[in-house]
């Protein structure tokens, strides 16, 4: 079986141009590898108006939930919720909010897994943060880059904990009517005048509930790496790589490389010694929006280097 996430509908911010659920966008798809046919799908944000595509990691694991062994797929949704699905049939098990700033919906229906405002009889959905051609500029959280976007996530199979790291912030959204022949971003304007922070979050996979949400001073694009030795690594855009305790997410060690970090950390061993390495440098992605809220990142030096650390 192949499991993968799909992108957002377009135009991204004008759902009136594309009424309906817009299947199979913003979804996890299960595809039979032999036939190429879709076995099941689960859509996270029908008729999406916020650019919450779900192309991030689809984690598969076996775990006991309420005393019952389950074959599970876990996913840090870009919309700010961690979803637990039955990977054999796509049925919804649970969802938990894993980021502080979230207002686009008032919650997830515990039976269906859909946003509580979702009405299948309507072609145009109105979630808690109303964004359409008639609405004024609205603050929407999470930001269009999500709480966790395409950044790698990780989990510890012995402790049954999943980890995600990303962005904690909001966007200001004003919808314009889409017109044929317009530019790629036609249909919406998204800016960020507020400060953009980050987060690292831990989920108990046996319950689907959040263990810890730790706010970070800067956004994360590098994802997260969990080790068998009780450490979790991530790196923020200011150039700081940090090792956290894998239970409490208390920071244990950090090092600033002097330039931005967007690449994921990796781990390997040589001669019985474990190392963590990551590529650093380059520009800040989507820099206009991110730098507007964190202007001190303008002073970061450029460059491209490989940093390697030994775990003693």
Feature annotation, model-predicted:
Residues 7-9:
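Short Ser/Thr-interspersed hydrophobic loop/turn segments at strand-loop and sheet-helix junctions
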Residues 157-163:
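Membrane-proximal interfacial segments on either side of biological membranes
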Residues 5, 76, 165-167, 235, ...:
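Residue-level marker for isolated small/hydroxyl-bearing positions within beta-strands
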Residues 12:
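Conserved redox-cofactor binding core of oxidoreductases
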Residues 145-149:
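Outer-membrane beta-barrel transmembrane strands
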Residues 151-153, 267:
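Short, surface-exposed beta-strand/loop micro-motifs that present aromatic residues
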Residues 15-54, 61-69, 81-139, 170-219, ...:
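Extracytoplasmic/lumenal domain signature
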């Amino acid at each position: 079986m192949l499991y993968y996430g799909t992108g957002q509908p377009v135009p991204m911010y004008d759902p009136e141009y594309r009424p309906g659920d817009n299947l199979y966008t913003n979804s996890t798809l299960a595809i039979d590898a032999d036939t190429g046919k879709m076995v099941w799908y689960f859509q996270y944000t029908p008729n999406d108006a916020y650019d919450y595509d779900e192309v991030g990691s689809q984690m598969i694991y076996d775990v006991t939930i309420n005393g019952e062994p389950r074959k599970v797929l876990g996913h840090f949704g870009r919309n700010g919720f961690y979803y637990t699905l039955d990977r054999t049939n796509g049925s919804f098990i649970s969802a938990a909010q894993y980021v502080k700033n979230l207002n686009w919906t008032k919650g997830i229906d515990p039976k269906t897994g859909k946003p509580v405002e979702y009405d299948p009889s309507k072609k145009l959905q109105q979630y808690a943060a109303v964004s359409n051609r008639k609405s004024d500029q609205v603050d929407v959280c999470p930001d269009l880059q999500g709480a966790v976007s395409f950044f790698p996530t990780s989990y510890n199979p012995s402790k049954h904990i999943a980890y995600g790291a990303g962005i904690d912030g909001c966007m200001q959204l004003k919808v314009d009517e889409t017109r044929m022949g317009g530019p790629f971003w036609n249909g919406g304007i998204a800016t960020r005048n507020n400060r953009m922070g980050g987060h690292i979050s831990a989920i108990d996979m046996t319950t689907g509930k959040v263990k810890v949400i730790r706010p970070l001073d800067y956004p994360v694009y590098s994802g997260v790496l969990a080790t068998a030795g009780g450490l979790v690594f991530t790196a923020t855009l200011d150039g700081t790589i940090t090792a956290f305790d894998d239970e409490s997410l208390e920071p244990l060690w950090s090092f600033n490389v002097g330039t931005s970090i967007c690449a994921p950390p990796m781990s390997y061993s040589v001669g019985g010694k474990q190392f963590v390495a990551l590529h650093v440098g380059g520009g800040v992605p989507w820099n206009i929006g991110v730098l507007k809220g964190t202007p001190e990142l303008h002073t970061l030096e450029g460059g491209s280097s490989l940093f390697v650390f030994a775990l003693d």
